[in-house]
């Protein structure tokens, strides 16, 4: 008989993370690499661990993640979102604390598109009165 597995999908900017939680020791594997190796920034690793801290389940689950698209920040946010959704399958009572921490809400902020006639989305070339 196999162990229980809990799955969740998280998204942030252009990143999509497919997350599996398996009861274990708290090891996080991202795209078949250790999380310290895959995400070099310590503050982003803290972001990834937020759902466990909020639900007091630190070190209880091994996390296996496939993530693609976006940069480090977007991928970390997508992983956090996926872990939070997977923890809901573990225990539906976590919903209140995860919702209060804002971890279940998909962050809808996206990069604004570049407009024609402007240098970037909002940056215009310098205005000359004369």
From Swiss-Prot:
GO terms for biological process: translation. One of its GO terms (cellular component) is cytosolic small ribosomal subunit. The keyword DNA repair does not apply. GO terms for molecular function: RNA binding; structural constituent of ribosome. It comes from the Bacteria. InterPro entries: Ribosomal_Su5_D2-typ_SF (IPR020568), Ribosomal_uS9 (IPR000754), Ribosomal_uS9_bac/plastid (IPR023035), Ribosomal_uS9_CS (IPR020574), Ribsml_uS5_D2-typ_fold_subgr (IPR014721). It holds the Pfam family Ribosomal_S9. PANTHER family: RIBOSOMAL PROTEIN S9 (PTHR21569), SMALL RIBOSOMAL SUBUNIT PROTEIN US9M (PTHR21569:SF1). Belongs to the universal ribosomal protein uS9 family. This is Small ribosomal subunit protein uS9. The gene is rpsI.
């Amino acid at each position: 008989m196999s162990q229980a597995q809990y799955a969740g999908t998280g998204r942030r900017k252009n990143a999509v993370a497919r997350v599996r939680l398996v009861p274990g020791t708290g090891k996080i594997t991202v795209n078949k690499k250790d999380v310290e190796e895959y995400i070099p920034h310590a503050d982003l690793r803290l972001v990834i661990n937020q759902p466990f801290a909020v639900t007091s389940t630190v070190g209880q689950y091994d996390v296996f993640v496939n993530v693609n698209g976006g940069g480090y920040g977007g991928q970390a946010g997508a992983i956090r979102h996926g872990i939070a959704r997977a923890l809901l399958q573990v225990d539906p009572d976590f919903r209140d604390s995860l919702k209060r921490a804002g971890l279940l809400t998909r962050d809808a902020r996206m990069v604004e598109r570049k407009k024609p006639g402007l240098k970037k989305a909002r940056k215009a070339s310098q205005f000359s009165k004369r």
